[in-house]
């Protein structure tokens, strides 16, 4: 197993080779040249990256295709978020998407007393018991990945007799100038849907229906 630094450098080089996409034709020899290491070490890194879910690998007649997974991209976006925090760079983002209905899970989770107390203490709101779900446009997925890399406002998880409720992170946001918060699990879940909480029933407040297109400004 290679070091985390070698993982990061390898994923970064693969992304550089891929440019705008997340896939690149890249031999282990070429990656070795890019990293300044032996071909054997580069081959081992590629195998480790694939085994640990950071990339997928396909061999074709044209050569080897390395595709960076969401887990691999998270390595880069987390590094970006850490550098932004260290350098005090603000990275507010705008995400566009479509209003969609969930399975009612948002209401169940938001209604937990242990969460509500923290929402009031840390976010300054007692939320409407439900979430507004937005299916993120393909073009906004890089912005969603960027948000996932940031720490946000920590909401502590807890246990009950029946189950465990995980920690959550929240980000201040606005939708049509109405303050709200984007919430997501601290344990990364790869989904193209974001959940929004507010002290208002946003569907009624903004007259939103499934299929409506919206933009959400998120403050990291």
Curated annotation (Swiss-Prot):
Q: Report the gene name.
A: ribK
Query: Which family does the UniProt entry place this protein in?
Result: Belongs to the archaeal riboflavin kinase family.
Q: Which organism is it from?
A: Thermoplasma acidophilum (strain ATCC 25905 / DSM 1728 / JCM 9062 / NBRC 15155 / AMRC-C165)
Q: What is this protein called?
A: Riboflavin kinase
Extract the ranges annotated as region (H-T-H motif-like). Answer: 1-92
Q: In which pathway does it act?
A: Cofactor biosynthesis; FMN biosynthesis; FMN from riboflavin (CTP route): step 1/1
Q: What class of enzyme is it?
A: transferase
Q: Which UniProt keywords apply?
A: Flavoprotein, FMN, Kinase, Magnesium, Metal-binding, Nucleotide-binding, Transferase
Q: Where FMN is bound, by residue?
A: 188, 195
- What's an example GO BP annotation here? riboflavin biosynthetic process
- The UniProt record gives the binding positions of CDP as 102-107, 200-203
């Amino acid at each position: 197993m290679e070091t985390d630094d070698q993982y990061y450098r390898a994923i970064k080089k693969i992304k550089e080779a891929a440019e705008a996409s997340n896939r690149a034709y890249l031999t282990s020899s070429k990656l070795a040249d890019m990293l300044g290491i032996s071909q054997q070490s580069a081959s081992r890194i590629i195998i480790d990256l694939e085994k640990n879910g950071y990339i997928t690998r396909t061999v074709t007649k044209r050569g080897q295709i390395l595709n960076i997974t969401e887990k691999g991209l998270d390595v880069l976006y987390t590094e970006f978020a850490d550098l932004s925090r260290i350098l005090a760079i603000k990275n507010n983002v705008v995400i566009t998407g479509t209003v969609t209905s969930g399975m009612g899970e948002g209401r169940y989770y938001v209604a937990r007393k242990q969460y509500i107390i923290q929402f009031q203490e840390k976010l300054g709101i007692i939320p409407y018991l439900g979430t507004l779900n937005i299916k993120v446009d393909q073009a906004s997925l890089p912005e969603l990945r960027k948000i996932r890399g940031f720490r946000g406002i920590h909401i502590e998880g807890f246990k009950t007799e029946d189950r465990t409720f995980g920690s959550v992170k929240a980000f201040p946001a606005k939708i049509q100038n109405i303050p709200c918060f984007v919430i997501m699990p601290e344990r990364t879940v790869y989904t193209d849907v974001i959940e929004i909480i507010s002290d208002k029933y946003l569907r009624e407040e903004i007259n939103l229906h499934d299929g409506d297109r919206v933009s959400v400004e998120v403050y990291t």
